[in-house]
């Protein structure tokens, strides 16, 4: 009986998390930044007018001193360029499951956080081409850096 209740509790917690943060509809993963070589990752989604989407990040990094970490995203709708935008991966609201440890000038930081949100203005095939940039920091180690789209 205890196992059944535990299983039910875990299931409800996971369902509740989706209700709070939204359903994942796309994910773009990075293992390194585009400071030397341009590394472009993309995802394409069929979106409808009025849908609300949000941009989240899942980060697990290690670095020394100061760091800036920015997603640069180019948007295409039905293969036509629409422009682009930038999002700071280190400034999220809300931030969830955060673990940040600093010792001296070395930091390890892991979290999930929301960076931005939109309401879709027209039906179409939306392509998000993303690049991850950082400030010059040769100590940066990316264990995980993912741009996650949810609705």
Spans of features found by a protein language model:
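C-terminal motif of bacterial Sec signal peptides marking the signal peptidase cleavage site
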Residues: 14-16
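Acidic, Ser/Thr/Pro
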Residues: 18-151
